[in-house]
Amino acid sequence: MLMVISPAKTLDYETPPVTQRFTQPQYLDHSQELIQQLRELTPAQISELMHVSDKIGGLNAARFGSWTPAFTPDNAKQALLAFKGDVYTGLNAETLSEADFDYAQQHLRMLSGLYGLLRPLDLMQPYRLEMGTKLANARGKDLYAFWGTRISEWLNEALAEQGDDLLLNLASNEYFSAVKRTALNARIINTEFKDLKNGQYKIISFYAKKARGLMSRFVIQERINDPAQLKQFDVQGYRFSAEQSKADNLVFLRDHAPE
């Protein structure tokens, strides 16, 4: 089983990594093509393109300017440890064992607007470039056109390497839309995490994002390889709902969030 998750806007390059092992991103030639184009934009143009403040636009202009394809532990950090935010709070990679990192390296991928697809131990230099960014480029009108079927093809390779055709989608719609299903040789398993609010079970963004991270960690630590085993997920009060689920769309409900 291969999992995909979204990246995060929040990054941590201050905390020392809990593992010294690292790998190099596999598709840096594509990243470099984007970087060269982004370097042509002023900070104000970056702010407008990304719909962010002048401060964040300036920060990312500086990041694009200093980006170099020579990735080392001195200028980059393992992607799974660099990303922060709700999904990564749930995943809590800082407490994984070396054996867990080995398993994650085979069975987890992070979708990325700049890097396309990242493995957990791939070094990553800081950036912000969301997949939904309408950056016109030589390949089309936006990043979905830029990546085309490449991400699906790379996922096919990763699926083949780890031994089955099961793809567990724990990414947002914005990011999973970069996966072209017609080019994907996989059985896709989707998940929904709902919390009780005002008498109804609803998807609450903050909790759902964290739950995707919790599920990722569950799969890594339990070495899950059968979709039926996913139904055993009962972390932080969630339970599987057979009533609301369909064959490849698993729904988990929770009545009370932890304090």
Swiss-Prot record:
A cellular component annotation (GO) from this entry: cytosol
GO biological process: response to hydroperoxide
PANTHER family for the chain: PEROXIDE STRESS RESISTANCE PROTEIN YAAA, PEROXIDE STRESS RESPONSE PROTEIN YAAA
Membership in a protein family: Belongs to the UPF0246 family.
Protein name: UPF0246 protein PFL_1025
Origin species: Pseudomonas fluorescens (strain ATCC BAA-477 / NRRL B-23932 / Pf-5)
